[in-house]
UniProtKB/Swiss-Prot annotation:
Gene: aroE
Catalytic activity field: shikimate + NADP(+) = 3-dehydroshikimate + NADPH + H(+)
Entry's Gene Ontology molecular function annotations: NADP binding; shikimate 3-dehydrogenase (NADP+) activity
GO cellular component assignments: cytosol
Enzyme Commission number(s): 1.1.1.25
Name used for this protein in its record: Shikimate dehydrogenase (NADP(+))
Organism, as annotated: Haemophilus influenzae (strain ATCC 51907 / DSM 11121 / KW20 / Rd)
Organism lineage string: Bacteria, Pseudomonadati, Pseudomonadota, Gammaproteobacteria, Pasteurellales
Active site, UniProt feature: 65 (proton acceptor)
Alphabetical keyword list: Amino-acid biosynthesis, Aromatic amino acid biosynthesis, NADP, Oxidoreductase
Length: 272
């Protein structure tokens, strides 16, 4: 049976095995998908051994996306620009192909929500690894992006890297333009740490829809809770993005595109 896995550290909390095995059942694919704890010191050796033993592909989560990218032989454009991958596939010639399905997963979930139209103004909070993975697909979807982060130099470098692909502007968190935003995306890790993104409430009130790339089981993320406390109710967490990026990884491996919405709805119901 073809073997796949998700690698991360920590990994016990990962929903990827549940999601991927549901996608496999839906599409009648015979495969096994498991969670693997990566060793912070020996991850590269572990991953190469995993493929040498016959595995067909894997997902990569924190903190290994950049390290896994370095091990690949070939790359998609979106992985190359992000300098990180969340998906590896073993090709027929034995080479490793790296892709990053985070951004296309986000775009697919925004389409599910009917929140994606050309020429929207989008504010993204945060310029870390999560942001790097989503910028190219958003720009390809003709979004006008304002990228805000506490460390302006990091934001500026990232915006300059992606400027050839669309309209993107770098600002510091305390100089976000006072304009209306069709969509505000939280790409900071505030949703995981229990904090909230350090953005002025008056800025948030200029938004129409609010998407947190984090999710929390059975409760609101801090960012979603903050939005609701301001009376902003057009909100979504990132669980749909998680299922959608998994579906795009699955498609890369198996050549079949699952119906991610039905799997999302099943799992979301179970999480409440």
């Amino acid at each position: 049976m073809d073997l796949y896995a998700v690698w991360g550290n920590p990994i016990a909390q990962s929903k990827s095995p549940l999601i991927q095995n549901k996608l496999a059942a839906q599409t009648h694919q015979t495969m096994e998908y498991i969670a693997k704890l990566g060793d912070l010191d020996a991850f590269e050796q572990q991953l190469l051994a995993f493929f040498e033993e016959g595995a067909k592909g894997c997902n990569i989560t924190s903190p290994f996306k950049e390290r896994a990218y370095q091990l690949a032989d070939e790359y998609s454009q979106r992985a190359k620009l992000a300098e990180a991958c969340n998906t590896l596939k073993k090709l027929d010639d034995g080479k490793l192909y790296a892709d990053n399905t985070d951004g296309i997963g986000l775009v697919t979930d925004l389409q599910r929500l009917n929140w994606l139209r050309p020429n929207q103004h989008v504010l993204i909070l945060g310029a870390g690894g999560a942001t790097k993975g989503v910028l190219l697909p958003l720009l390809q979807a003709q979004q006008n992006i304002v990228l805000a982060n506490r460390t302006f130099s990091k934001t500026k470098e990232l915006a300059e890297r992606f400027q050839p692909y669309g309209n993107i502007q770098a600002v510091s968190m305390d100089s976000i333009p006072l304009q209306t935003y069709d969509l505000v995306i939280n790409a900071t890790s505030a949703g995981l740490s229990g904090g909230t993104a350090s953005v002025d409430a008056e800025i948030l009130k200029l938004g129409s829809a609010f998407y947190d790339m984090q999710y929390a089981k059975g409760t609101d993320t801090p960012f979603i809770a903050l939005c609701k406390s301001l009376g902003l109710t057009n909100v979504s967490d990132g669980f749909g993005m998680l299922v959608a990026q998994a579906a795009h990884s699955f498609h890369l491996w198996r050549g079949v595109m699952p119906d991610f919405v039905s799997v999302y709805e099943q799992l979301k119901k179970a999480m409440l």
